[in-house]
From Swiss-Prot:
GO terms for biological process: defense response to bacterium; innate immune response. This is Tick defensin 2. PROSITE patterns: INVERT_DEFENSINS. Disulfide bonds join 4-26, 11-34, 15-36. Belongs to the invertebrate defensin family. It holds the Pfam family Defensin_2. It is found in: Secreted.
């Protein structure tokens, strides 16, 4: 979700908008999960 697996930037900006998170990346076998950090 959130742009994954094709648009990692969308995932990153989604996570950046959540308080306490710096950004995000696509994880999983097929990079289909947006993981915030």
């Amino acid at each position: 979700g959130y742009g994954c697996p094709f648009n990692q930037y969308q995932c990153h900006s989604h996570c950046k908008g959540i308080r306490g998170y710096k950004g995000g990346y696509c994880k999983g076998a097929f990079k289909q999960t947006c993981k915030c950090y």
